[in-house]
Curated annotation (Swiss-Prot):
Official protein name in the record: UDP-N-acetylmuramoyl-L-alanyl-D-glutamate--2,6-diaminopimelate ligase
Modified residues (N6-carboxylysine): K206
Reaction equation(s) it catalyzes: UDP-N-acetyl-alpha-D-muramoyl-L-alanyl-D-glutamate + meso-2,6-diaminopimelate + ATP = UDP-N-acetyl-alpha-D-muramoyl-L-alanyl-gamma-D-glutamyl-meso-2,6-diaminopimelate + ADP + phosphate + H(+)
Subcellular location: Cytoplasm
Pathway(s) annotated for this protein in UniProt: Cell wall biogenesis; peptidoglycan biosynthesis
Function: Catalyzes the addition of meso-diaminopimelic acid to the nucleotide precursor UDP-N-acetylmuramoyl-L-alanyl-D-glutamate (UMAG) in the biosynthesis of bacterial cell-wall peptidoglycan.
Residue numbers covered by motif Meso-diaminopimelate recognition motif: 391-394
Gene: murE
Sites where the protein binds meso-2,6-diaminopimelate: R367, D391, N392, P393, R394, G441, E445
Enzyme Commission number(s): 6.3.2.13
Keywords assigned: ATP-binding, Cell cycle, Cell division, Cell shape, Cell wall biogenesis/degradation, Cytoplasm, Ligase, Magnesium, Nucleotide-binding, Peptidoglycan synthesis
Positions bound to ATP: G93, T94, N95, G96, K97, S98, S99
Family under the similarity heading: Belongs to the MurCDEF family. MurE subfamily.
Length: 474
């Protein structure tokens, strides 16, 4: 009789699971998925108790063949990491995912719940001290890694989890068969066409969140200002998915925002009632992010007045319109045409009369090349001064990337400075009273990728040091 997976694991004294030979621990079962078969010997050498493969050539007494390795992995995950927070909210969108998942977790915490968020900026935990967990460089990590973190969070008493669901992750089924209580769509614009090839493919990948992962009694929360909102609503109607729209044309209708360098006041109508609240978070585009986060929590059975009160206390996310040393220098992750346009437009609208708006940015290498020229055009059309520099060039020629950006600039209000640190110094040294400087593209990142090398680099840190040096404080 063929042993069950549980019996097999007991026989080989398996203590954990891994699908990465680099991080495998002694007595793990190693799942050789795709090119993982090339690392079976490495996994065994590092102490793997057992290897699961779908390649018959490699079988031994410790290397077991299965027909469907992904299904077997999911079965194994339920054996080893069965726990997860009781309420989960997933957020997709071109821009705004990191902000919304953090806002959701913060709201839960502010109303007395233990909550966490997972995404681009890592794992944020509220209500538990000394929780230490990191994720790799993916917005949506693989299913095994996700379930390990979710299991650990649940074991530590976390009841509420908000996480980012990227188009790559959804397309590659990194969420497995996971079901969520609420699914949010923050925004949609050009990005990742190097992977999806067309905007239609990109949109359909994101919509998998709602058809594949939203629980039957769950709700979708959509940004009504998405250009493709009619298509999205028709798609959800076709699949009988309940949804709420947030925005200027939504069921949760944003009627007015008053913004300044100190924050904003947001007015909206929800359930036929008028509300308003103040927030220190800068950016009128963040109004929709905050009001996607608020109802997300409300629809998991919390009083709306408590949610509104919490919204006034929510803090900005690192690298998202982050203000440096209370100056007029801002760090933002804007790395798409739409995000760049929104960030620049917002800062232009709130800058003092007579002040100039400058931007420092570049574009990542080995990523969507079609957006570079457009981003150059957008930057030059809104900002008074543009400084084109390097982002994460990776394996591309940095100068060629800069030239693609510059090809979209039809004015003469730009300068090219390859070294990002020097570009930031230059931008800060040339700031005058009432001027605003936006350093865009990398946001929270504390590294720069050049070739295969990851070099320590933090925009906010460099900007802070440059400002203090310019002010004569250092």
């Amino acid at each position: 009789m063929t042993p069950t997976l549980k019996q097999l694991f007991e026989k080989h004294n398996v203590k954990g699971l891994s699908n990465n030979s680099k991080t495998i621990k002694a007595n793990d079962a190693f799942f050789a998925i795709k090119n993982g078969n090339d690392f079976i010997a490495d996994a065994l050498e590092k102490g793997a108790a057992l290897v699961i493969t779908d390649d018959k050539k490699n079988t031994t007494n410790k290397v077991i063949f299965v027909e469907d390795i992904k299904e077997t992995l999911h079965e194994a995950i339920e054996l080893f990491y069965p726990k997860k927070p009781k309420t989960m909210i997933a957020v997709t969108g071109t821009n705004g995912k990191s902000s919304v998942v953090s806002y959701i977790a913060q709201i839960y915490s502010l109303i007395g719940q233990k909550a966490a968020s997972i995404g681009t900026i890592g794992v944020e935990v509220f209500g538990i001290d000394n929780f230490n967990e990191s994720i790799g460089g993916l917005t949506t990590t693989d299913y095994l890694s996700f379930r390990k973190i979710a299991h650990k969070l649940a074991k530590n008493g976390i009841d509420y989890l908000a996480f980012e669901a990227s188009s790559h992750g959804l397309d590659q089924q990194r969420l497995g068969d996971l079901k969520v209580n609420v699914a949010c769509f923050t925004s949609f614009s050009q990005d990742h066409l190097d992977y999806h090839h067309t905007k239609e493919n990109y949109l359909l990948a994101k919509l998998k969140l709602f058809t594949d992962h939203l629980a039957k009694d769950g709700i979708a929360i959509l940004n009504s200002d998405i250009e493709e909102i009619k298509f999205i609503k028709d798609y959800l109607d076709k699949h009988k998915i309940k949804y709420l729209c947030v925005g200027a044309n939504g069921n949760c209708k944003i009627t007015k925002t008053n913004s300044s360098l100190k924050g904003q006041n947001i007015n909206f109508i929800f359930d036929n009632k008028n509300y308003d609240f103040d927030t220190p978070i800068i950016g009128s585009f963040q109004a929709s992010n905050l009001l996607i986060a608020g109802p997300s929590v409300y629809y998991t059975s919390f009083d709306f007045s408590k949610v509104i009160n919490a919204l006034t206390k929510v803090k900005a996310v690192k690298g998202r319109m982050e203000r440096v040393n209370r100056t007029n220098i801002f760090i933002d992750y804007a790395h798409t045409p739409d995000a760049l346009e929104k960030a620049l437009t917002e800062l232009k609208n709130i800058k003092a009369k007579g002040g100039k708006l400058s931007i420092i940015f570049g574009c990542g290498g080995n990523r969507d090349t079609t957006k570079r020229k457009l981003m150059g055009k957008i930057a030059a059309s809104i900002a008074d001064n543009v400084i084109v520099t390097d982002d994460n060039p990776r394996h591309e020629d940095p100068k060629a990337i800069r030239q693609e950006i510059i090809s979209g600039i039809v004015t003469t209000n730009y300068i090219e400075i390859a070294d990002r640190k020097e570009a930031i110094k230059y931008g800060i040294n040339n700031l005058k009273k009432d001027d605003i400087l936006l350093i865009a593209g990398k946001g929270h990142e504390n590294y720069q990728i050049i070739g295969d090398e990851k070099i320590r680099f933090d925009d906010a840190e460099v900007a802070s040091m440059s400002f203090l040096a310019t002010a004569g404080i250092q």
